[in-house]
Amino acid sequence: MKTKYRISVLPGDGIGPEVMREAYKILNILKNHFSLPLEIKEFNIGGAAIDQEGVALPKKTLLGCENSDAILFGSVGGKKWDHLPIDKRPERASLLPLRKHFNLFANLRPAQLYSELKYLSPLRSDIXIKNGFNILCIRELTGGIYFGKPTGRXLKKNNIEYAFDTEIYYDYEINRIAHLAFQLAQTRNYKVCSIDKSNVLNSSVLWRETVQKVSKNYPDVHLSHLYIDNATMQIIKDPNQFDILLCSNLFGDIVSDECAIITGSIGMLPSASLNEKKFGLYEPAGGSAPDIEGKNIANPIAQILSVSMLVRYGMNLKKIADKIDQSVISVLKKGYRTADISNNNNYLKTNEMGDVIANTLISGE
């Protein structure tokens, strides 16, 4: 491990600063209790940066991220900045440029339904079953139809308007995301399901062929393929059959949100975006939730689990990441809840949940 591991913390807007305060409790425990050599610096991002520095992604923030080993991100955006041009708003002008600047091509979205929270899932109880489910959706983030050229809108001579986008994938883009999926499968349950539409799309034919070739390097991992339409049905029908879902940009955008909603609370779900050097941006899967900003009722678990993902994938310290995850599970088993996951009015405030998880991590109970 490095003698110093530098983390740029970007709290952002809405509930971002509130849940980030709870993540700091975990970071301080990692420094002081587990003796991890963390160097933590905080920078402005999003609407907060617009208000204070005039732009959503200040040069100082970008430079700080360049000089770090990982980014811990909160959330950005809110109605306050909706009057700005779209490309100047916090969401478009901060997070997307960060992803592009650091070439964060792989998005990891765990979707876990804890057995203690199965009542939250919209799925029938016999589908969610007593042990819940744990899926990791791996989405290619920098290729595909969102970035393909040409794209645009036009008008034909007979006044018929039309629009077009281009789905394009290069084999190296598929190759690197596939290798990552198989490598992560070797740390989990040795199963990868690749999702495509190769019965219709040429880009999906290349996707399936490339993933199949890469799989030969990982004979211990079982590979299966599903068309996107069937995959979305199978996830609802029996999520337990899946471990890792490997998806293109468009399909991953759809599938990762589907996996998230069947857990019942997006406030529980972290995410990571990685580049080829395993530099990563770690953030909750949810948004800035301005409607509950300042009420001290936001769920900090997704932000805390984002720290766990940073430790697992950025620092490669699986055992310590497991301890953070286990602390969350232990707290849930004891019946502690925040407002979004409580089935009654007896719930903890944001800071109280952070304290309980932090104390559990220290005690190991």
From Swiss-Prot:
<keyword id="KW-0100">Branched-chain amino acid biosynthesis</keyword>
<dbReference type="GO" id="GO:0005829">
    <property type="term" value="C:cytosol"/>
</dbReference>
<keyword id="KW-0464">Manganese</keyword>
<feature type="binding site">
    <location>
        <position position="253"/>
    </location>
    <ligand>
        <name>Mg(2+)</name>
    </ligand>
</feature>
<feature type="binding site">
    <location>
        <position position="229"/>
    </location>
    <ligand>
        <name>substrate</name>
    </ligand>
</feature>
<keyword id="KW-0963">Cytoplasm</keyword>
<dbReference type="GO" id="GO:0009098">
    <property type="term" value="P:L-leucine biosynthetic process"/>
</dbReference>
<keyword id="KW-0460">Magnesium</keyword>
<dbReference type="GO" id="GO:0000287">
    <property type="term" value="F:magnesium ion binding"/>
</dbReference>
<dbReference type="Pfam" id="PF00180">
    <property type="entry name" value="Iso_dh"/>
</dbReference>
<keyword id="KW-0560">Oxidoreductase</keyword>
<dbReference type="GO" id="GO:0051287">
    <property type="term" value="F:NAD binding"/>
</dbReference>
<feature type="site" description="Important for catalysis">
    <location>
        <position position="146"/>
    </location>
</feature>
<dbReference type="GO" id="GO:0003862">
    <property type="term" value="F:3-isopropylmalate dehydrogenase activity"/>
</dbReference>
<keyword id="KW-0614">Plasmid</keyword>
<feature type="binding site">
    <location>
        <position position="99"/>
    </location>
    <ligand>
        <name>substrate</name>
    </ligand>
</feature>
<comment type="pathway">
    <text>Amino-acid biosynthesis; L-leucine biosynthesis; L-leucine from 3-methyl-2-oxobutanoate: step 3/4.</text>
</comment>
<feature type="binding site">
    <location>
        <begin position="78"/>
        <end position="91"/>
    </location>
    <ligand>
        <name>NAD(+)</name>
    </ligand>
</feature>
<comment type="subunit">
    <text>Homodimer.</text>
</comment>
<feature type="binding site">
    <location>
        <begin position="287"/>
        <end position="299"/>
    </location>
    <ligand>
        <name>NAD(+)</name>
    </ligand>
</feature>
<comment type="similarity">
    <text>Belongs to the isocitrate and isopropylmalate dehydrogenases family. LeuB type 1 subfamily.</text>
</comment>
<dbReference type="InterPro" id="IPR024084">
    <property type="entry name" value="IsoPropMal-DH-like_dom"/>
</dbReference>
<dbReference type="InterPro" id="IPR019818">
    <property type="entry name" value="IsoCit/isopropylmalate_DH_CS"/>
</dbReference>
<keyword id="KW-0028">Amino-acid biosynthesis</keyword>
<feature type="site" description="Important for catalysis">
    <location>
        <position position="197"/>
    </location>
</feature>
<keyword id="KW-0479">Metal-binding</keyword>
<feature type="binding site">
    <location>
        <position position="257"/>
    </location>
    <ligand>
        <name>Mg(2+)</name>
    </ligand>
</feature>
<protein>
    <recommendedName>
        <fullName>3-isopropylmalate dehydrogenase</fullName>
        <ecNumber>1.1.1.85</ecNumber>
    </recommendedName>
</protein>
<dbReference type="InterPro" id="IPR004429">
    <property type="entry name" value="Isopropylmalate_DH"/>
</dbReference>
<feature type="binding site">
    <location>
        <position position="229"/>
    </location>
    <ligand>
        <name>Mg(2+)</name>
    </ligand>
</feature>
<feature type="binding site">
    <location>
        <position position="139"/>
    </location>
    <ligand>
        <name>substrate</name>
    </ligand>
</feature>
<comment type="function">
    <text>Catalyzes the oxidation of 3-carboxy-2-hydroxy-4-methylpentanoate (3-isopropylmalate) to 3-carboxy-4-methyl-2-oxopentanoate. The product decarboxylates to 4-methyl-2 oxopentanoate.</text>
</comment>
<keyword id="KW-0520">NAD</keyword>
<feature type="binding site">
    <location>
        <position position="109"/>
    </location>
    <ligand>
        <name>substrate</name>
    </ligand>
</feature>
<keyword id="KW-0432">Leucine biosynthesis</keyword>
